[in-house]
Design a protein with these regions (language model features):
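Soluble non-transmembrane domains of integral membrane proteins
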Residues: 1-230
Length: 231
């Protein structure tokens, strides 16, 4: 939920964006072709103070000889969150790992103040198209795929959005698909494969935005992200 924004004008209840009741969630990490998504089983969390007063939360876990660390760096003023995923191996065999990010939800309409329901859907930005809507019907008709340098992916609704923004100097494979059994749509991207060897580590960093459509803040985070704003 967003602490500084209320559901009703003058109300005390915070506005909820990511909501398990709508099956609306975001995640990042690694997967392998043999094991699928690697489950970190986080068992430890610590908090520290970073540069300019930023709150940093670090989660740590271990599964089958692989250590996981997720560092979450919260912006003091804005709604952008820097996320660093790191894995270290104590396994003798080399493992090919793929960094990924994901936003997943169903197509339930979003209830807003005044009982108004507004547009909800995915948007992609790439070198091919700086602002490409690919709605729920499009995804059902055909899964989305586009390989591009930089870019970003977002789920937008009236006034608010969630978005993942990767390393702009690297190439990423953007995707969207529908899981009929679960009734959920997922959008995201994968980054370049890495070889995880014994004693080595792989790090992936991304920016996650969850909050209102603030043009200046969005433009400062990444080029064309302010195109998500309704004028």
């Amino acid at each position: 939920f967003l602490k500084n924004i209320s559901l009703e004008k003058g109300g005390e209840d915070p506005f909820v964006v990511l909501d398990p009741n709508n099956s609306y969630s975001a995640n990042s990490g690694f997967y392998t072709r043999s094991q699928g998504y690697l489950r970190p089983n986080f068992s430890k969390i610590s908090e520290s103070l970073g540069v300019n007063g930023k709150n940093i939360y670090t989660l740590e876990g271990e599964t089958n000889g692989i250590s996981f660390k997720k560092k979450i760096e919260m912006d003091v003023v804005g709604y952008g969150i820097k996320i660093f995923d790191e894995i270290t191996s104590t396994i003798n065999d080399d493992i090919t790992v793929t960094p990924y990010v994901l936003i997943e939800r169903d197509n339930s309409p979003v209830k807003e103040s005044g009982l108004m329901y507004t547009y909800l859907g995915p948007v992609f930005s790439s070198t091919r198209d700086t602002y490409e809507k690919y709605d729920f019907d499009d995804i059902k008709d055909a899964p989305y795929q586009n390989k591009t340098f930089g870019g970003w992916v977002a789920f937008i609704q009236h006034y608010f959005l969630t978005a993942w923004i990767p390393d702009q100097s690297a190439e990423h494979l953007y995707q969207a698909r529908y899981n009929e059994n679960r009734g959920k749509y997922s959008v995201g991207y994968t980054s370049k494969d890495s070889i995880l060897s014994y004693g080595s580590k792989v790090v992936s960093s991304n920016v996650f935005y969850v909050g209102p459509k603030l043009p200046k803040q969005l433009a400062n985070i990444e080029e064309n992200l302010d195109l998500t704003v309704d004028y």
